[in-house]
A protein has these predicted regions:
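Active-/binding-site microenvironments in catalytic and ligand-binding cores
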Residues: 24-338
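Bacterial N-terminal signal peptides that target proteins for export
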Residues: 1-10
């Protein structure tokens, strides 16, 4: 076992070295745009969250009502590909005679074995590239080690305290009489393979009389979250595809200078995609080319009900992102405050 572990470690380090030497020669100026915030930028679109933007967003808080946009993170939720997540409880302090001191103090702890892109999570800029080239023309092959990235880690992001804008795409499709739901959904949902267009986004904004402004985070409800909430029974169906952003819709959002976009599915963009020859092109458009963050597996059903009741599609968006050095993504906790 020790020999196998050693060989595995050697193989991993060797692969890193090969990647570094082979890919570090990339001329990323030819494949990825430069950041508008300068050649040293690793912050991306969160540069748009200025004190003035946060202060203006705080005006959205009228009653102090808090609605969660976060799915429970628990064993058994749908996971993409070979990703894993498992919790193990250590309750040694509860064993007979294990209490500490005269006051019989006991304790429990957890071991959390999980990849970072699980549950409601943020895709960082180091998650997606074009070949060796990542956000702001960074050649990633020479900026990684066995443990993490040395550039584009989550520690460079500004706090996500800004205005959120909610778009109920289910209502848009219902009003246009083009909703094709999935029979596995208990509530209306837009079926997989449906391309969300710029016209769809603008129709959704019109429902709440909202105009996007620089620094916003956009959250889109497709109803697909209902399959996530039926875990593990509907995990296969949840992972089989999704409605999502097409490339034109992504371009339109980029032009609005948003900070991030999140959907109630596992990839944000339409699956199956618009072209069989491309893999996750919207990810590259948003993250690699523009530093706009992606939030996946957002819980949108509660907010959809809230917006339907109040008619307000804007809110104070508060998302906690750990200062996780060198990580490509992370679980997040998101609250919508009105």
């Amino acid at each position: 076992m020790r020999l196998m572990s050693a060989l595995t470690g050697i193989a991993f380090v060797t692969s890193i070295a090969m990647a570094s030497s082979a890919l570090a020669q990339s001329d990323c100026t030819k494949t990825v745009p430069a950041s508008p915030w300068g050649k040293e930028d690793q912050t991306g679109a969160t540069n748009r969250i200025t004190p003035a933007v946060t202060k203006a967003a705080a005006a959205e808080i009228k009653e102090g009502k808090v609605t969660s946009l976060t799915n429970d993170l628990v064993d058994g939720v749908p996971l993409f590909g070979t990703r894993f997540s498992k919790t193990v409880l250590t309750a040694g302090g509860l064993a007979p005679g294990a209490g500490l001191g005269k006051n019989d103090l006991t304790y429990m702890e957890d071991t959390w074995l999980s990849q970072s892109h699980v549950g409601t999570h943020l895709d960082g800029m180091g998650h997606i590239g074009r070949g060796d080239c990542y956000y702001n023309q960074i050649a990633m092959g020479k900026n990684i080690n066995q443990n993490n990235m040395t550039k584009l880690g989550l520690e460079h992001l500004k706090p996500f305290q800004t205005r959120g804008v909610f778009i109920d795409m289910v209502k848009v499709y219902q009003q246009a009489n083009k909703l094709k739901s999935n029979p596995n959904c208990r509530t209306p949902c837009i079926d997989k393979g449906t391309v969300i267009t710029p016209d769809d986004l603008q129709a959704g904004l019109k429902l709440t009389n909202t105009t996007l402004r620089e620094g916003d985070v956009v959250i889109i409800h497709t109803g697909w979250v209902d399959l996530f909430l039926q875990h593990p029974a509907k995990n296969t169906e949840y992972n089989s595809g999704e409605a999502g952003l097409g490339k034109a819709a992504a371009k339109w959002l980029i032009d609005q200078k948003i900070v991030a976009v999140g959907l109630d599915n596992w990839a944000v963009e339409v699956i199956p995609g618009e072209s069989q020859d491309e893999a996750f092109p919207v990810h590259q458009m948003l993250l690699t080319d523009n530093g706009i963050h992606i939030i996946e597996n957002v819980r949108t059903d509660l907010m959809a009900a809230q917006v339907a009741s109040s008619g307000r599609g804007t809110f104070f968006f508060s998302m906690t992102v750990p200062k996780a050095v060198g990580l490509t993504g992370t679980f997040v906790a998101i609250d919508a405050i009105q």
